[in-house]
């Protein structure tokens, strides 16, 4: 129940409040991004109303576009160093790294009490999944696994077109 309520609060804040009314600088989340290029770029670009305070990527060249977009964010190559230096300044973390690093980065973030958005796959085995589930409950944080097919703007846009009658009668979808 707690997670449903907390997730609902975060959803309302992310979707309704900022998009309709703007977000006060005093009410912005301080977000750290781990994995800045590629899929990471698509993820951090979805939270323009929040405050990106740290960015971490082992591939500095690939991350350069994101780094330049947030000149005030502190830059790191190692997420462990980022957490050591900045954990008190971070509210939530976006993790868009290669699959094999999801568990380690997520667990450190949870242990520090940070809310976490993790790209799919969430984990490599059932033990990691159960450990993450227990950690989210224990540390009372909100977590979400991203699945780009369901979290990108395109799907929402098509739904709006359908609801507005722009598409007409839909007979078949592939």
Which functions belong to the PLM regions below?
Residues 1-7, 11:
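Single conserved hydrophobic/aromatic residue that forms the stacking wall/gate
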Residues 81-88:
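Short amphipathic alpha-helix with an adjacent loop that forms part of the alpha/beta core around
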């Amino acid at each position: 129940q707690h997670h449903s309520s907390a997730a609902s609060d975060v959803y309302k804040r992310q979707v309704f409040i900022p998009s309709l009314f703007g977000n006060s600088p005093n009410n912005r989340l301080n977000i750290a991004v781990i994995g800045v290029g590629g899929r990471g770029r698509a993820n951090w670009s979805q939270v323009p109303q929040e405050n990106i305070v740290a960015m971490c990527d082992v591939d500095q060249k690939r991350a350069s576009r994101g780094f330049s977009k947030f000149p005030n964010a502190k830059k790191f190559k190692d997420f462990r160093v980022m957490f050591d230096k900045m954990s008190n300044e971070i509210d939530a973390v976006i993790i868009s790294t290669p699959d094999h690093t999801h568990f380690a980065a997520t667990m450190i973030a949870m242990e520090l009490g940070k809310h976490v958005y993790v790209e799919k796959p969430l984990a490599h085995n059932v033990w990691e999944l159960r450990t993450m589930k227990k950690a989210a409950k224990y540390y009372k944080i909100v977590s979400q696994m991203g699945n780009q097919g369901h979290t990108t703007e395109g799907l929402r846009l098509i739904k709006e077109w359908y609801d507005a009658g722009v598409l007409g009668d839909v007979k078949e979808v592939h």
